[in-house]
Amino acid sequence: ECGAPDNSMAALEYAMSLGCYGMECDIYWTKDNDIIVAHANGDCKVNNLQPWTATVAELRAAGRLSNGEELPTLEEFIRRVMVEGNCTRLVLDVKRVDKPYAQPEYVINAARRACEIVTEMKAKHFVELICTGFNLDAMKAAHNCAVIAEVPIGMNSSRSGKEYGTLGFGWANLSAASGMDAAAGGKGSCSLEEYEKAGVALSVYNVDQRAGDGNAVYSTAAVNYYIANYKRFRTLCSNYPKWLIGKIDHAYKVYDGIRSEADFEAFAESLASDPTGRRFLDGNGEVVLHCDLTLNGFVPLSNFSGTFNGNGKTLTIGYRGDAQQIGLFKRLSGTARNLTV
């Protein structure tokens, strides 16, 4: 969204400027027992090197990020978020190591060393962990490290809610596209209700504005599902955080009646999911029109079941079309009064 490379300091600064809950950071253990924050390729390589075979200096010498930044370490990222007034956490994604073959010991090393650094820097309130679920030993080891460091930990796996509870994990992190079910716009079999029933908090990645990420959903129906249910999720991850925050703010904003054409448009949009228009109600339970408005390109509103108090004002509507569609509401099962149209 901001054009910064993944896992860059610029991306972190952007997330912090928006007041995001957190930024996901991919982490790997290095040969010199440090942790780099980097997005590896399909061969688990960063700058054409597998991180666990190289030192931080060697990885940095092999190349920079596309914006010219030096490859960052976890310590540098922690130092940046531990500042007065910042609310953005680092959500450390302990990446699987499966190239050229599965090597869970390096996943365990990454979880262990990351938690040690967090403890050394007294940063437990600024960091959370997500561990890959591909290897049971790595998963259990990461969980133990996180518990000792007092850092929240989730698992990235489409296991059932019941399995999460059995393994001691209270937080699941799933792909929106392949993990979540059709009701959420995905192709998987996991549902929000299943995890709620099991007492497991649920995060998903990603809810996006457009196609481009294989784990993302971006259809209007899917986006609307997550917006309608976002308070039931632990976190929603997105490659377009400013866009998603704006969508959520718009959907949950509480209005003082209708005072502008923009307010009226928001009211009309809200009726699709809430025919009472509750976000626009005053203390008497009415939607009050506070000024005369001229509406162009008007489409009759969805079913309205509340009370629309025109407050003696006038709606002037520019309309051309089927005479059967003329009217303020397609269906009115409530009351409209004190209004001139």
For each of these PLM feature ranges, what is it?
Residues H250-V341:
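Surface-exposed repetitive/solenoidal architectures
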Residues E1-K253:
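Phosphate-group recognition and catalysis centered on beta-loop-alpha active-site segments
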